[in-house]
Amino acid sequence: MRPLAIITGAGSGIGKALTLRLAEKNVDVIAVGRRISKLESTQKENPARIKIVQADVGNDDGREKIVKAIPSGQTLKYLVHNAAVLDPVIPLSRININDWRIHQAINVEGPLFLTQKLLPSINGGRILHISSGAAHHPYSGWGAYSTSKAALYMLYLVLREELKDSDIRIGSIRPGVVDTPMQDKIREVPESDFPALQKFINLKEQNKLSAPSIVAKFISWILLETADDEFSAREWDIRDESHQEFWMED
């Protein structure tokens, strides 16, 4: 039986590209997202391998819906926590509690409690967090996003410790700055709320954003081809040249 992957945030950007990449590699994929039209667009490119689930990872009903989508008798091999929100970009002095809680619900609670529900289904499998440089570097205006990504990084570290004696491995990757709808929104934010705005405009204008398909190659290599001890040992960074020869030419 083919291996099974669950990918959240699979309607666009990195999640969509990774879904298609794994499907090409003969992996069955449950593609999860909130917008059904985006998911259907993803599924049309490989309907034999891709099953879609419209669900919000930020609430328990959505997470339970994902769990129930696993076909009977099929073992979950890969769980990729890609879904995330960045909006609104606003100083912490002005963020409201509802927006703050949405960041925590989707970016932190979603990965934690979906992992918790799926642990019994992951036999000898791998869990991967899609992290961000924002977890390690503060940007004015990204307070809610940065703190949620920092929490996600710590979840990776703690789960790695707690699962070290099991047959489940957990990893984390930093995909760099990627040409996704999230980046489109970032460039529309007023500079008064996001002082680093021009940096991100320049990256786009200078063609320095990575294509989601390139990032998907990187992630699929980590998921499918690295050894267990390598997979969990550190947070992988796409910009680290030491590993690029193993996946960039594929």
Label each residue range with its predicted role.
Residues 82-88:
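Conserved NAD(P)H cofactor-binding loop of Rossmann-fold oxidoreductase domains
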